């Protein structure tokens, strides 16, 4: 009884992985035999065994004992040295391949058959097993064959596609009698199968009970070693082990018994298998579906044709065997050894032959799938007898080598154990699910199959196809015709009937020209010849396709009658609508009445309305739950439309995906109440239109939706009309990707006819009503597209923001102690930062602008009563919901590479900024520093930098202050600082030069810009103007607050600044559309995030943090702790002085100033609200792309700037200068006072001491902190000597000469530098063509000479006059070329010597004081 115990062990080990049918049974459970790869030896052994068995048939058990190697769990690894069949990992260096024989224990589940008699040992050899079964009474034989616990040995080799698998056939259960009869034939190996198209296959031999059950090549891709795509032809490289010769009458009785038992019950459904793991591979499923659906089981004739598809061959041996076992069990009762001899032969072949056949057998039992090795492919159909005859004839003609029973699919590899093992063990039910588990519709891969009932038809003439020939299913006649035509290269006489003869079975010989033409047209090709059997999975596909076509024909007939019956169709659609829609007239009228009588207003953040793309975090779940039900209603409604269920899964998905929101809008349109200008949310609350958040381009969307709703509601559609209109919106034949267009068009036309009927009935006096209604469909689609985009953007942003929050918490904790920033400040920063990544960023600057935390509520907590532009009012909530606000504002934590990775220390950070300027200036970006008073700057930043085209900045400041307390962790990046560059939001930021950049900005209220123009840019423009006004007001009310107005760089005419931006986007429809498209993610920040854990970045951040800490400690009251603390502030130069109110107002009035300039000049991190949007701008700012020369120059300038800034800062308040530039401390008020004298031209005076450490360019983002610290200390010392220089130095950033900002920074302030003992080099640049639009594209033309000269002059001056200061004035007269005069001047000569241009001058004078 060892065998029984072994079998039990196998069962336990197999678990529920499925019972593998075996030819041993409980009474004769067999032990595993590993089949030697040398099959010749195996034949000899088996011969001997067979003789022994014949001598003592009854004692087969004991015989098997002698052969038994090990119980089931044993795994034998045998290495066969064979010429390398394929250069895969299995091939050893010596050219041999390791063939691993493993019992398939995973998939083996012992079927506990109570009827099993004594425990028969696992019989090793086929002969033993067969002999045992032969000698055993039929019952025993059945048990033998049904034993599921027999272990399998799977030999898997990866073979080249064109390698013949020369194998000597060991007797296989299917060919045993043949083995006896024709040993000589068996000794010769059958002609190898050439799988020439398959490049990598795994040759799998499944040995169960010592018999080679299956020898098949499976696509390697399906297996663990899979390398190549699935073959286009049969996977099994060779037929099951022994060539199956036409077994007309001589099959041994035991063979018959076994196969009878296996497959006789023609339609008996297999008993449910032991709990199978995941569903089995599709081939089984489809066949089984085919059988289980009541179609007669595939019979031999039915089996004739199999479509060869390139799907992976999933091995399903176990399930097939299991099914076979079950069938055998059922069959046991009606079996007699020789009765069903013929059927058995066929069935046997089928059952052992292919996974598809076996699955079909499993399901239907009696389908015989004879698969010939020649291209004749058998597919199962119900015409058994005909096919049997055909096959037998072919078999006899083909002879033994040509035909062999397709093997059961090789068992799945362990990799797929979960799914395929279940398939192996699973019964037909599981099989049914299996093909679907692969996710492919059976018919989808066989679009060209034509069926007549269950018969595949020839694609050329419509006759009964005999197989898959030359790439298509064709009959023998057309196959031969095509073969003759191509082999003999026959040139047929051209057709005399216009070459349009219809080729039918009855007339196919009349016109050979047209017949050949049609052969080629349907896809016949000499190259499509396949060798070997049709892959089993394809066979299964064909069966499924047949079955489906049969079903579909019946269903379509029923559907045709239903669609043609208009009243019935009307009733069905109306019923579906009423059952699935919660917003019928009655229900909604009650809700509207209640809303008017006692409105319960919903705050936008808590909005539960389909149009709100961004419900606040806590309400998002509730919103989703409430709204999911509505969406489900639409899906259910679609499913109830007659004919929808007949569509393929792909078509259903396509229609629903494209039309879901359209139908949803039609249903929800009644929730918009234009009388009270509000929307009734799904939770019954009312939300006013002006309260809906304007973020994420939502204002444009909301306005459009309200307009559309008003238009639709004015039509007063009835429920029947709404239901039919929803159906038409869903079932639209013009959706791309539809397959069954014919049916969809038919449904559409019928539904449209129903709608026309209803409309004519309800509105006899409005004949044009239907046309008017259908005209709304394009608008409806546009709305749903916009809405979907916003939702997608919101989701992405949301995830991004959450992620940012999570990792910002660590940093935030660090920075918390140092920064007592007000929460709003940090929050604004967060938004700012968020803007960089926000996909919305460039899309909907409008909304972001609206969302900008411009709401006074957020700004005033600072106590600054700043008039916020009207646009910002609606978004007051945004700041209160920082996360939401950040999300909607299109912000994304702007962790610029410069800030995060590369700004390890202040030196690096500033190098980043200035260096990137050098890079940017070449690309036409302008960096306009505005010098501000420190206090002003901080306050203004708290107020937010309004003029950033996103008023977000305005609120950014205040919001920053509040929110920094709330979200200090966010603040860490965000406030990182003033250095955060914001990409320009202007239309130019897309890299597209519209040519319409005008200097006038129409003042437009936030609500007014909801035309189809790019909401974002138009609002930006409006915001710029309004921001300018607001800044001006702020400056007036709070002279201490100087607002840095940074607007997209447009021609800066200070006088026209308020009118600058409005028209820009309005005139560019294409640009509007471009800007509405969701932008790409900010790749820099994404990379940053990816590399954040990297130790290099950690170290840099750590260093940053330390410097920031030191700076914070040294910072004085003059500089806000805001500017001092954040480690991320490092990129910001020490002192960015805010210009005096006059300067600020000029700047504010000048929307033309680049936002970039604002970022650069903005000293306190609070201002970092305006984070960059466009990936293009960001990439332009990415410093690593600078050339070494640029880096060197930027380094020099940066060091100078740092030193000078720190000097300026320290001059006013001791210790400020000591702060490393990373602290981005704003210069003391005195500096600002000096700066108040600056004219419209921005002047950068950098005074650095001789001992400035390194001019050598620090590698990107990693300038040594020591250099920065030394520079700061040196600058502090120099600053102490030179208090007034602070104003001059306050402008840290190198102003790109073509910065168009006309900030009123009077060069007079440069006199501050006069005190410093260090020699100064003053570079004054007048930019003539300040009106030139900013072009961010990397291929932008080089800056005009005036700007170029400024850059070059600055850099060259530094290099040329290392010890000497010079006034280099590059003045670009508006008309003429710039005159650059470099005159060495004593350092004492005040820079003021360069007369400050009047603020009104259009030429911006950039004065760069470079210390030698």
Curated annotation (Swiss-Prot):
Bias type Polar residues, positions: 69-81, 124-133, 151-164, 1206-1219, 1231-1253
Gene name per UniProt: Eip75B
Induction: The expression of this protein is developmentally regulated and is correlated with the 20-OH-ecdysone induced activity of puff 75B.
Protein name listed in UniProt: Ecdysone-induced protein 75B, isoform B
PANTHER family: ECDYSONE-INDUCED PROTEIN 75B, ISOFORM B (PTHR24082:SF473), NUCLEAR HORMONE RECEPTOR (PTHR24082)
Entry's Gene Ontology BP terms: cell differentiation; ecdysis, chitin-based cuticle; hormone-mediated signaling pathway; intracellular receptor signaling pathway; molting cycle, chitin-based cuticle; negative regulation of peptidoglycan recognition protein signaling pathway; negative regulation of transcription by RNA polymerase II; oogenesis
GO molecular function, one term: RNA polymerase II cis-regulatory region sequence-specific DNA binding
Region span, Disordered: 1-96, 110-204, 258-298, 321-448, 837-878, 984-1021, 1044-1064, 1108-1174, 1204-1317, 1368-1401
Species for this entry: Drosophila melanogaster (Fruit fly)
Biased composition (Gly residues): 15-25
Intracellular or extracellular location(s): Nucleus
Zinc finger intervals, NR C4-type: 458-478, 495-514
Residues in the DNA-binding region annotation: 455-531
Family that this chain belongs to: Belongs to the nuclear hormone receptor family. NR1 subfamily.
Occurrences of domain NR LBD (ranges): 565-813
Taxonomy of the source species: Eukaryota, Metazoa, Ecdysozoa, Arthropoda, Hexapoda
């Amino acid at each position: 009884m060892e065998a029984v115990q072994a079998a039990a062990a196998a069962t336990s080990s197999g678990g529920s992985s499925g019972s593998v049918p075996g030819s041993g049974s409980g009474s004769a459970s067999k032990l595993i035999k590993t089949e030697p790869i040398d099959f010749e030896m195996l034949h000899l052994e088996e011969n001997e065994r067979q003789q022994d068995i014949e001598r003592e048939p009854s004692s087969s058990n004991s015989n098997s004992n002698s052969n038994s190697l090990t119980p089931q769990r044993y795994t034998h690894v045998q290495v066969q040295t064979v010429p390398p069949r394929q250069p895969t990992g299995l091939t050893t260096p010596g050219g041999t391949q390791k063939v691993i024989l493993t019992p398939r224990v995973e998939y083996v589940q012992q079927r506990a058959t109570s009827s099993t008699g004594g425990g028969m040992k696992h019989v090793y050899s086929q002969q033993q097993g067969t002999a045992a079964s032969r000698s055993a009474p039929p019952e025993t034989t059945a048990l033998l064959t049904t034993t599921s616990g027999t272990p399998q040995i799977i030999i898997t080799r990866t073979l080249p596609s064109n390698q013949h698998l020369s194998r000597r056939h060991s007797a296989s259960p299917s060919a045993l009698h043949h083995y006896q009869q024709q040993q000589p034939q068996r000794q010769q190996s059958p002609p190898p199968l050439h799988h020439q198209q398959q490049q990598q296959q795994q040759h799998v031999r499944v040995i169960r009970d010592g018999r080679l059950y299956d020898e098949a090549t499976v696509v390697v891709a399906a297996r663990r070693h899979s390398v190549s795509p699935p073959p286009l032809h049969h996977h099994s490289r060779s037929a099951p082990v022994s060539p199956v010769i036409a077994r007309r009458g001589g099959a041994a009785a035991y063979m018959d018994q076994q196969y009878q038992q296996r497959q006789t019950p023609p339609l008996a459904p297999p008993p449910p298998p032991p709990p199978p793991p995941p569903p089995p591979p599709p081939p089984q499923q489809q066949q089984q579906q085919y059988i289980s659906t009541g179609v007669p089981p595939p019979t031999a004739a039915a089996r004739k044709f199999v479509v060869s598809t390139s799907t992976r061959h999933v091995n399903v041996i176990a399930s097939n065997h299991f099914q076979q076992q079950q069938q055998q069990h059922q069959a046991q009762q009606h079996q007699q050894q020789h009765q069903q001899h013929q059927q058995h032969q066929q069935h046997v072949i089928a059952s052992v032959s292919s996974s598809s056949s076996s699955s079909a057998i499993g399901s239907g039992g009696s389908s015989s799938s004879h698969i010939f090795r020649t291209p004749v492919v058998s597919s199962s159909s119900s015409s058994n007898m005909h096919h049997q005859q055909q096959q037998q004839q072919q078999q006899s003609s083909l002879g033994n080598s040509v035909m062999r029973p397709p093997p059961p699919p090789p068992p799945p590899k362990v990799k797929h154990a979960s799914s395929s093992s279940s398939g192996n063990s699973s019964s037909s039910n599981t099989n049914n699910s299996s093909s679907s588990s692969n996710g492919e519709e059976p018919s989808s891969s066989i679009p060209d199959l034509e069926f007549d009932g269950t018969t595949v038809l020839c694609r050329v003439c419509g006759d009964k196809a005999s197989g898959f020939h030359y790439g298509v299913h064709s009959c023998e006649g057309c196959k031969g015709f095509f073969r003759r035509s191509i082999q003999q290269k026959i040139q047929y006489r051209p057709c005399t009937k216009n070459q349009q003869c219809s080729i039918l079975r009855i007339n196919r010989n009349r016109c050979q020209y047209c017949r050949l033409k049609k052969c080629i047209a349907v896809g016949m090709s000499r190259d499509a010849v396949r060798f070997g059997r049709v892959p089993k999975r394809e066979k299964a596909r064909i069966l499924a396709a047949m079955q489906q076509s049969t079903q579909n024909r019946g269903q379509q007939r029923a559907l045709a009658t239903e669609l043609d019956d208009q009243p019935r169709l009307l009733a069905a659609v109306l019923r579906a609508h009423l059952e699935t829609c919660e917003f019928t007239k009655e229900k909604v009228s009650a809700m509207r009445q209640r809303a008017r009588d006692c409105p319960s207003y919903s705050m936008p953040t808590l909005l539960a309305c389909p149009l709100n793309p961004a419900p606040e975090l806590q309400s998002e779940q509730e919103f989703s739950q409430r709204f999911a039900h509505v969406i489900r209603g639409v899906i259910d409604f679609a499913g109830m439309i007659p004919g929808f269920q007949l569509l393929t899964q792909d078509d259903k998905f396509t229609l629903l995906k494209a039309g879901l929101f359209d139908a949803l809008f039609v249903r929800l349109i009644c929730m918009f109440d234009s009388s009270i200008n509000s929307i009734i949310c799904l939770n019954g609350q009312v939300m006013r239109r002006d309260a809906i958040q304007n973020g994420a381009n939502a204002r444009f969307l909301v306005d459009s939706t309200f307009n559309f709703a008003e238009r639709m509601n004015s039509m007063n559609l009835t429920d029947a009309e709404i239901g039919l209109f929803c159906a038409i919106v869903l079932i639209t034949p013009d959706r791309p990707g539809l397959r069954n267009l014919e049916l969809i068009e038919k449904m559409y036309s019928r539904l449209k006819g129903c709608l026309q009927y209803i409309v004519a009935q309800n509105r006899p006096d409005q004949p044009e009503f239907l046309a008017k209604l259908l005209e709304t469909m394009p608008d409806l689609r546009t709305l749903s597209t916009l809405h979907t985009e916003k939702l997608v953007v919101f989701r992405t942003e949301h995830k991004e923001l959450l992620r940012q929050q999570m990792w910002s918490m660590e940093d935030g904790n660090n920075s918390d102690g140092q920064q007592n920033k007000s929460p709003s400040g940090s929050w604004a920063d967060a938004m700012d930062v968020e803007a960089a990544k926000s996909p919305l960023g460039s899309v909907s600057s409008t909304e972001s602008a609206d969302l900008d935390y411009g709401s006074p509520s957020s700004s005033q907590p600072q106590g600054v009563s700043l008039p916020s532009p009207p646009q910002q009012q609606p978004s007051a909530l945004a700041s209160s919901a920082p996360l939401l606000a950040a999300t909607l504002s299109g912000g994304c934590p702007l962790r610029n590479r410069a800030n995060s990775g590369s700004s390890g220390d202040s030196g690096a950070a500033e190098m980043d900024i200035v260096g990137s300027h050098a890079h940017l200036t070449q690309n036409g970006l302008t960096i306009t520093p505005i010098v501000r008073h420190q206090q002003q700057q901080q306050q203004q930043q708290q107020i937010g930098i309004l003029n950033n085209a996103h008023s977000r900045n305005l609120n950014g400041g205040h919001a920053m202050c509040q929110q920094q307390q709330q979200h200090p962790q966010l603040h860490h990046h965000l406030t990182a600082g003033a250095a955060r560059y914001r990409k320009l939001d202007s239309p130019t930021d897309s890299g597209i030069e519209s040519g319409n950049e005008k200097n006038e900005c129409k003042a437009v209220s936030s609500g007014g810009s909801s035309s189809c123009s790019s909401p974002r840019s138009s609002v930006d423009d409006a915001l710029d103007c309004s921001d300018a006004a607001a800044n001006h007001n702020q400056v007036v009310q709070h002279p201490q607050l100087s607002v840095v107005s940074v607007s997209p760089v447009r021609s800066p005419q200070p006088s026209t600044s308020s009118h600058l931006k409005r028209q820009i986007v309005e005139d560019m429809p294409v640009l509007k559309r471009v800007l509405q498209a969701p932008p790409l993610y900010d790749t820099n920040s994404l990379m940053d995030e990816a590399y954040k854990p990297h130790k290099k970045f950690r170290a840099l951040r750590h260093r940053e943090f330390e410097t920031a800490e030191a700076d914070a400690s040294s910072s004085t009251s003059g500089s806000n702790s805001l500017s001092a603390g954040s480690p991320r502030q490092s990129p910001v130069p020490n002192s960015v002085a805010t210009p005096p109110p006059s300067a600020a107002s000029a700047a504010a009035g000048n929307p033309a100033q680049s936002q970039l300039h604002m970022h650069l000049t903005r000293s306190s991190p609070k201002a970092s609200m305006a984070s960059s949007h466009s990936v293009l701008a960001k990439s332009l700012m990415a410093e690593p792309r600078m050339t070494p020369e640029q880096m060197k120059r930027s380094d020099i300038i940066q060091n100078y700037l740092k030193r000078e800034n720190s000097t300026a800062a320290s001059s006013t308040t001791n210790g400020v200068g000591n702060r490393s530039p990373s602290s981005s401390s704003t210069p003391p008020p005195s500096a600002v006072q000096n700066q108040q004298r600056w004219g419209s031209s921005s002047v950068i005076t950098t005074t650095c001491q001789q001992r400035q450490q390194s001019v050598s360019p620090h590698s990107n983002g990693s300038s040594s902190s020591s250099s920065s610290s030394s520079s700061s200390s040196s600058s502090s010392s120099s600053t102490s000597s030179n208090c007034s220089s602070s104003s001059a130095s306050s402008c840290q950033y190198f102003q790109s000469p073509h910065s168009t900002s006309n900030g009123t920074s009077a060069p007079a302030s440069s006199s501050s530098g006069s005190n410093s003992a260090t020699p100064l080099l003053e570079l004054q640049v007048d930019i003539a063509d300040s009106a030139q639009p900013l072009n961010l594209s990397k291929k932008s033309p080089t800056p005009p000479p005036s700007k170029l000269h400024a850059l070059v002059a600055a850099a060259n001056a530094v290099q040329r006059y290392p010890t000497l200061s010079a006034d280099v004035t590059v003045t670009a007269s508006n008309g003429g070329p710039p005159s650059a005069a470099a005159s060495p001047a004593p350092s004492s000569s005040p820079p003021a010597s360069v007369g400050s241009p009047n603020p009104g001058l259009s030429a911006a004078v950039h004065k760069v004081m470079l210390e030698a």
